[in-house]
Every structure is written in structure tokens, then in C-alpha cells.
Amino acid sequence: MSQLTIALTKGRILLETLPLLEAAGIAPLEDISKSRKLTFETTSPDVRLLILRGSDVPTYVEFGAADVGVSGKDTILEHGSTGFYEPLDLRIAKCRLMTAGIAGETLKPGRIRVATKYTNLAKQYYAEQGRQVDLIKLYGAMELAPILSLADEIVDIVDTGNTLKANGLEARDHIADISSRLIVNKASMKMKHQQIEALIDAISSAVNERAAA
């Protein structure tokens, strides 16, 4: 049987993905959280795990360095590729992609500045709104941008909204609902169809059982 490579990313998505993989008979032989390794053998001899930066997972899957990956819908949309299949919503790491700004302030007319790490999604969203924007690419501490007048709005992931409130900001417009998805390389789906279909079925069952619990 061919080896199957699954790309994951550390953090919340990994913590919520591992139980789904375990339900499919796949568990790392080492504690990922205590290791600096980037590849891990598993209890299934024909499956190995890769630990990547979240934004890199779609790229590894698209170009076949990984057969399967788990990625947030925000990352998939920002990546913008049609180079892989997206057969399953894992219904984990749920949140929303939203605009946000200073609480109580009205957005000024005309051209605005928007800070975000999702520049492609933001460009598309504001174009659909008929709004001209200058985009500022940031990688973290997004809430500081409106506070320090670097930007009029931000586009970011919102979970509870508590971080926004703690920094005097408010969520504004909803852009997309986000959750983690299983993605599959197109060539791998053809070459390793039986293995991948079995994996999808097993994980899908685990997702449904979790939802019913």
C-alpha cells in the first residue's frame, strides 16, 4: 500500500484534528506538542503526518508534497487555488471572518485603509462593496492598527469578540463563516483513491459522531 502524507498545522486546529484522526485509526507515535520534529510516523504504517505553518498547508497539498491536509477555510479562500479537492467540512475551529473598527465610530466616506493578513479576501470583499481601499499586510496584533490610526478597519478572524472589545474595537460586517476543511491533492485522489476514500469515510463518521454527542 502506498504511503499517505497528511499535512497538519500546530495550534487549535491540530488539537481538534487529532481526535478525528485517532477515530480513523491514525495517531502519532510521539507527542507532537513536545517535539521539534516536522514529520511523524503513526499507528498506521502507511500514514505519516507533516506539521506545517498553517498558510503552507494548501500549497503542500496543491503541489503534491502532501496527499491530504487540514486547513482553515480562511486560509483556503486566501490561497485561492483550484488545485485540490475539498471533500469534507470537519466542523472544528469554527469562527467568522469579519471587518472591525473602533467601537462607536462610523466609517468615513471615500478611500480607506484596511489592515489584514487576508489581502486577497479583503480586496475581493471591498470591491464587491464598491469601496476603494489601500490594503496593509500585517501578520499579527491586528487590533493595534485602528487604535494607532494605521488603518480605518481591519479584516480578521473573530471567535468570541472578546479581544476586540478589550481593545476598544467592535466587529462590523460578516464576510464568511470559517471552519477547518479536509483537502486532497487531485492527482493523489486518482492514484490513491481507495486509501483516501477510506480516510474520508472514517473521518466523516467521526465528525458526525462528534456532532451527535
Curated annotation (Swiss-Prot):
Its EC number is 2.4.2.17. It is found in: Cytoplasm. It catalyses: 1-(5-phospho-beta-D-ribosyl)-ATP + diphosphate = 5-phospho-alpha-D-ribose 1-diphosphate + ATP. One of its GO terms (biological process) is L-histidine biosynthetic process. It comes from Saccharophagus degradans (strain 2-40 / ATCC 43961 / DSM 17024). It comes from the Bacteria. Its main location: cytoplasm. Pathway: Amino-acid biosynthesis; L-histidine biosynthesis; L-histidine from 5-phospho-alpha-D-ribose 1-diphosphate: step 1/9. This is ATP phosphoribosyltransferase. The gene is hisG. GO terms for cellular component: cytoplasm. Signal peptide: none annotated. InterPro entries: ATP_PRibTrfase_cat, ATP_PRibTrfase_HisG, ATP_PRibTrfase_HisG_short. Catalyzes the condensation of ATP and 5-phosphoribose 1-diphosphate to form N'-(5'-phosphoribosyl)-ATP (PR-ATP). Has a crucial role in the pathway because the rate of histidine biosynthesis seems to be controlled primarily by regulation of HisG enzymatic activity. Lacks the C-terminal regulatory region which is replaced by HisZ.
